[in-house]
Amino acid sequence: VLLGVLALAIILERLWTLRRNEVLPPGLGQEVRNWAVRGRLDASHIQSLRASSPLGALLAAALDVRGKPRDLVRERIEDTGRHLVHRMDRHLNALGTIASAGPLLGLFGTVVGMIQMFLGILDHGVGDVNQLAGGIGKALVCTAAGMVIAVPSLIMYRYFRGRIAGYVVEMEQEATALLDAMESGKAGAAARPPSAAADARLAKGRA
């Protein structure tokens, strides 16, 4: 019963925490790319982004090292991603342990019940067959209870792991898009001054 309550609490907590809108807020990636293009990457924007969601934390990590070589930025993204996965995996190890240990504990209870029943037979004889069958049934209830707890726990454990893996892929895509946007903005900024200088020289020549 205790394992069942614990498993239910973990499942409900993870369902609430791993909601898509909480991990990957809609439109956040595009909004941050617009910041990058417009040069609105001040410390307050980045700090609020970092605290907003796991996706925001990943994009903020990329912005912390903007202007550095792409390999360094990607390394920072991967490092931050590992920390975020660890945070999203919170309590899942416990849920997986419950899924694995539930049937074993149920089987243990069944074995103990069977041993007690056979020891009773040794002391008092077989007695009533119906009573013997009832004792066996009560012992098997332990195994059934363990499986009732383990099967949903295993299903939800796999579900959460799959959801987290999907989130990680999407966050990496958003981070890559941000890198591309920053590099495009950098290239555009580098291309503008020569053009401006050429226009100035042309205007001076006309004068």
Predicted stretch roles:
Residues 21-108, 112-126, 156-207:
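Predominantly long cytosolic amphipathic alpha-helical stalk/bundle segments
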Residues 7-8, 44, 59, 106, ...:
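Residue-level signature of catalytic and energy-coupling elements of molecular machines
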Residues 1-16:
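Hydrophobic alpha-helical transmembrane segments
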Residues 1, 130-161:
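Pore-lining and gate-forming transmembrane alpha-helices of multi-pass membrane transport proteins
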